[in-house]
Amino acid sequence: MFTLDKTYSATYEEKKSKFIAYLCAYSEFDILLKQLKNEHPKARHIVTAFRYINEIGQIVEGSSDDKEPRGTAGKPALHVLQGSELINIGVLIVRYFGGIKLGTGGLVRAYSDAVNLALKECELIKYEKRENFKFTSSYSDLGKVEYHLQKIGITEIKKDFLSLHVEINLEATHKQIEELKAYLKN
């Protein structure tokens, strides 16, 4: 399975209709949807689809046709995510109607093609399950700890500065956490 770490977009045109597909990390999905509604107030539709792994390891999927004929927009976008083995990803497709009806088959192809075009722009990352890890560091060691975290590729860090030490909460792969534990023992 694969995921991505930033938002990508591509524009596809079919019979004067414009389809702007945005692929994003699922954690950014709701924020991006609100942003697109503000940025594209004249768009006829904003179709969505998503896939993510929940806290108990199940794949959760969903889609919305946003007033397009049922099954012609969100489902085809979701099928592209499934077929490409993408996870923890959302896709949002902004459609501007060009005045020519595409028909149900045309809509299915157009939405699928828009997502596939955006996928060609992406740098996909192999998905690795991430875990939470919490530890403390003295203020004097914090710089060295931060350097080591950066060195092993851990970037999702939350620090709480307490009176005697710093509490660090992070999210990383199992391998990264094991490397960090080995470093902290020394």
What are these regions (language model features)?
Residues 1-71, 174, 182:
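C-terminal regulatory domains involved in ligand/effector binding and gene-expression control
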Residues 87-97:
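Glycine- and acidic-rich phosphate- and metal-coordinating loops
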Residues 105, 112-130:
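Long, charge-dense
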Residues 124-139, 168:
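Short glycine-/aliphatic-rich beta-strand segments at the starts of folded cytosolic domains
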Residues 136-155, 179:
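Short amphipathic alpha-helix segments
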